């Protein structure tokens, strides 16, 4: 990296968590990512660089940090860094190189952002998309996706976005009438992004 113009800089740290649902500062669903959490310093100039394991294999692409904000004395890296998992970054870069565009997975669900229970409540289903074809309906509360516990709508969005279009997902949901049901289906593709 080259933070503050200091070329050849390397930082070290440990991976604290995998599959950490984080947002990059906006409440727009596009800003949610499935991240690797690390305490390796990420500063302007070395974000976008690789996160490597002890054998030099790339495991992620450094992309964001948590900060205390300008109202606190500490700014910059505080030991909470986030990297995009390499398999996700590689899929997108391969698409961009091949087609000039990238795709993202689409399930065809909107979630209720006022729901405060554990899980993500389905507020809307897009006609003709994967969720409707699988039999999902409004009012379901998504509890797990591929075995990962869903705590809220952010966790649900991040779990879906960790996949590629066409991947098969398994969603377990609580029915409005009680009980649970499992839905297994392939994800659709959202329109390509330039």
What are these regions (language model features)?
Residues 40, 54-58, 67-68, 81, ...:
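C-terminal recognition in membrane/secretory proteostasis and scaffolding
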């Amino acid at each position: 990296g080259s933070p503050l113009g200091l070329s050849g800089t390397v930082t070290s740290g440990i991976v604290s968590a995998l599959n950490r649902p984080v947002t990059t500062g906006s409440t727009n669903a596009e800003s949610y990512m499935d991240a690797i959490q690390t305490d390796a310093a990420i500063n302007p100039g070395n974000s976008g660089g690789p996160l490597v394991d002890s054998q030099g294999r790339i495991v992620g692409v450094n992309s964001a940090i948590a900060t205390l904000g300008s109202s606190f004395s500490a700014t910059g890296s505080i030991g909470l860094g986030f990297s995009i998992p390499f398999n996700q970054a590689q899929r997108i870069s391969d698409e961009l190189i091949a087609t000039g565009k990238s795709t993202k997975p689409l399930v065809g669900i909107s979630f209720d952002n006022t729901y405060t229970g554990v899980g993500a409540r389905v507020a809307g289903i897009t006609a003709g998309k994967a969720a409707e074809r699988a039999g999902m309906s409004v009012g379901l509360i998504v509890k797990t996706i591929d075995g990962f516990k869903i705590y809220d709508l952010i966790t649900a969005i991040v779990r879906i976005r960790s996949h590629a279009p066409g991947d098969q997902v398994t969603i377990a949901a609580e029915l409005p009438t009680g009980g649970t049901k499992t839905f297994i289906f392939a994800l659709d593709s959202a329109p390509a992004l330039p």
